[in-house]
């Protein structure tokens, strides 16, 4: 029996576990296919997984976990330099891939095992300890090469069980999404989550509003997405009443990986009657907070700490903040069973990430409301702007800018200013490129909605904002442009 996935042997074997397009596997079939992989990789140390959005990726990862072997998911879109670094750093014994998948040069030198989604094997007895590594997931290399966060089996189980409590997630739920499978969001939450519950996941292969509507109309109960996906939904809703009706059928709409703009929240709710809930996590911590299914779905917040997660806000000197006033900004630190154990081969970076008493420094800045709801204001390195003696979060200014009818997309950064320390800079994609709003118009708009000291002093007009695979705006690319 698998302690991570008891439904592989203890549930109804005929229930569909995975569906990717027209291909699907029942729990009995998944157990057999993953069992066959497990038999071949047992004792391998670490295995890389070429994480294409296919059945074979899910089978490969589950097979590695059944064998007690850590899986290293690889982004198929990685450049050769980054891929070479990840493979050199993680030293996998072999690479699991779908038959026919073409591997680039850095991976082509590894022993390759093609995953047979119709393989036949037995689910092995689970002998792994909860402290054993489950996954090594590489973080974005914003200040250097990517670091491999080692996620223990304990963290995967703890975060998925906490989300089950918060979201009332059961075996009856059918999840639909089109997320990449080399990140925590798509792989851990989007594939391992349904499998731990004994439910089903339908992967779209590639996100599209028509696919979302089709699956929700065909019995799917939950939708996971990133803000870019929900923005596309919000844009499509006025012309697609069928999409609105389908979304109205969902039990739960969940957004993560970056903040969902309040404007998109409001447009989706107005058209569907549904509210999108947000959660907050990162590679090193898995999930920390969420709006609960039975809680108040408050746009612009990421809810309350999940069961088992301790969360505090601290000053720059590490002093804990006691304020629950919705205004006092501090860095989020977390502690709990959901945390990673180390950065692979990076003891100095691991030590620097934790306080002496075991709190992980997230680098995310937030405020807490009176009832404990957490509102992220941005990253400490890129989103906290110190201007005129104020600590200002970029996120609330971005939301205010998006309320302006002339703004389609917005990002906010700070840049040095001799008088203010830093001045606020807005980067916008105008709704009408022929008539973009100017700095005075946007400054007045923000000052009226927030406060004068939060108004942008500089505005840049762009055709698009740079984003990564998960839809996050790459602010360092803006600042360096």
Ranges and model annotations:
Residues 14, 121-138, 145, 168-174:
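Conserved pre-ATP/AMP-binding loop-to-beta segment of ANL
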Residues 23, 38-81, 391, 430:
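Conserved AMP-binding/adenylate-forming
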Residues 49, 336, 341-342, 365-454, ...:
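AMP-binding/adenylate-forming catalytic core of the ANL superfamily
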Residues 157-174, 182-222, 236-237:
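Conserved AMP-binding/adenylation subdomain of ANL enzymes
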Residues 221-225, 235-298, 310:
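Gly/Ser/Thr-rich phosphate-binding loop
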Residues 312-333, 352, 370-371, 433-439, ...:
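Conserved beta-loop-beta connector loops within the AMP-binding
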Residues 324-340, 359, 365-366:
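AMP-binding/adenylate-forming core of the ANL superfamily
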């Amino acid at each position: 029996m698998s302690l991570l996935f008891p439904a592989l042997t203890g549930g109804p074997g005929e229930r569909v576990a995975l569906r990717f397009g027209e291909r699907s596997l029942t729990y009995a079939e998944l157990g057999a296919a993953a069992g066959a992989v497990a038999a071949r990789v047992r004792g391998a140390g670490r295995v890389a997984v070429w994480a294409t959005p296919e059945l074979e990726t899910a089978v490969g990862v589950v097979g590695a976990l059944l064998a007690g072997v850590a899986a290293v998911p690889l982004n198929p879109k990685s450049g050769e330099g980054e891929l070479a670094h990840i493979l050199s750093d993680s030293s996998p014994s072999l690479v699991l891939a779908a038959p026919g998948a073409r591997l680039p040069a850095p991976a082509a030198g590894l022993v390759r095992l093609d995953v047979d989604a119709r393989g036949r094997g037995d689910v092995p007895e689970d002998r792994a300890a909860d402290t054993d590594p489950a996954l090594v997931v590489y973080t974005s290399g914003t200040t250097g090469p990517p670091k491999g966060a080692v996620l223990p089996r304990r963290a995967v189980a703890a975060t998925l069980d906490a989300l089950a409590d918060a979201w009332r997630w059961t075996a009856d739920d059918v999840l639909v999404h089109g997320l990449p499978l080399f990140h925590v969001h798509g792989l851990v939450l989007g594939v391992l989550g349904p499998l731990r519950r004994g439910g089903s996941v339908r992967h779209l292969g590639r996100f599209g509003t028509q696919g979302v509507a089709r699956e929700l109309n065909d019995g799917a109960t939950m939708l996971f997405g990133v803000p870019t996906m929900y923005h596309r939904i919000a844009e499509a809703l006025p012309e697609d009443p069928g999409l609105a009706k389908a979304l109205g059928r969902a039990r739960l709409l969940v957004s993560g990986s970056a903040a969902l703009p309040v404007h998109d929240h409001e447009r989706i709710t107005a058209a569907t009657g549904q509210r999108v809930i947000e959660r907050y996590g990162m590679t090193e911590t898995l999930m920390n907070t969420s709006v609960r299914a039975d809680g108040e779905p408050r746009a612009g917040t990421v809810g309350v700490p999940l069961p088992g997660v301790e969360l505090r806000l601290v000053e720059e000197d590490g002093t804990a903040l006691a304020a629950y006033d919705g205004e006092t900004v501090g860095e989020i630190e977390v502690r709990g069973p959901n945390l990673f154990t180390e950065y692979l081969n990076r003891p100095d970076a691991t030590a620097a990430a934790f306080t002496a008493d075991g709190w992980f420094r997230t680098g995310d800045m937030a405020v807490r409301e009176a009832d404990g709801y957490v509102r992220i204001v941005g990253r400490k390195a890129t989103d906290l702007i110190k201007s005129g003696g104020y600590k200002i979060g970029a996120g609330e200014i971005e939301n205010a800018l998006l309320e302006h009818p002339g703004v389609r997309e917005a990002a906010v950064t700070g840049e040095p200013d001799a008088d203010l320390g830093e001045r606020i800079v807005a980067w916008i994609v105008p709704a009408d490129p022929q008539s973009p709003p100017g700095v005075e118009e946007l400054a007045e708009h923000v000052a009226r909605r927030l406060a004068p000291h939060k108004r942008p002093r500089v505005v840049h007009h762009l055709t698009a904002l740079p984003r990564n695979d998960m839809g996050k705006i790459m602010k360092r690319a803006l600042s360096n442009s």
